[in-house]
Amino acid sequence: MEKEKILEFYKQTSQFTDLGYYKDFAKNLPDDIEQLCILQRMQIIHPVAFRDKEIRNKKDCFWGDMTKVPVTRLEYEDDIFPTSQSVIAELLRKNPNYTTKREAKDKVHVTCRSQAILLASILKSKGIPARARSGFAEYIHYNGICYDHWITEYFDEKENRWRLVDADEHCPDHEMEFDLNDIPYDKFLFGANAYLGIRQNKYNPKTILYSSDPPILGLKASIRGLFYDFHALMNDEIIFLHMPKYIQDKKFELFEEEYKELDNLANLMLNSNENFSKLQEIWNNIPKFRIMSGALN
């Protein structure tokens, strides 16, 4: 019974994943996960690529003719397209042909979070339980550092199990040691694992990195991953600016009792399906975990 409850929960959408009038459009996209990821990847330019001057001067690269992309475009368009619906609406506004042939000038510049929630949204539109997941991945550069990253997790009904998939990394110039459509769970460091690993001195703080400018390392980075993932597990895929206000106000310097509260949350998140009801209880009864800071508050 609990399993059915969980699967039904992750078929539901949030203000970030609801596609509104674009639900039927998404429902008719390819069912094959590889085709779906490649198609989605070709609609998007990662902001890190857009800000690279060498890439910006290329007429023929993976991203397309980058010389035709106006320099006035925002590097990080996550600011203006925070929801899956807004991403699809902008893509179709620029060019209604949603194909792998989309020109660079008609793509949007968003990060892994948008890739993760967009894929989750499309899968939900097809009636497939799906959720965005936040954490850290060493496979971004294979240099020993785990960079903050978002991926998608969905339930494979045929195999009766959850799968991890990374739409953002479907790039031909990035070779992986595993299948991006079925990522081994030990290859992705979820927010809770990173947080507890730092608390227990399992990880060198310098190897857990949140890609702000300047970068945030260690415990403070892991707290971000912890809360991004907790909210995602509750179908609330908050944007990067959102973080519990009490933590932001304290500049991520907490009392030991407050860290112990997070220890409890993180330990439950290690097995989010088994502890789903307990996580929902925390969600419903500890408002400080949900009162967010943002750009204007």
Regions found by a protein language model. Give the residues of each.
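Active-site neighborhood of thiol-dependent amide/isopeptide-bond enzymes
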Residues: 69-150
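A short, structured loop/turn motif at beta-sheet edges
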Residues: 31, 124, 157-159
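Secondary-structure boundary elements
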Residues: 2-106
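His-Asp-centered catalytic microenvironments across diverse enzyme cores
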Residues: 5-14, 37, 41-46, 56-73, ...
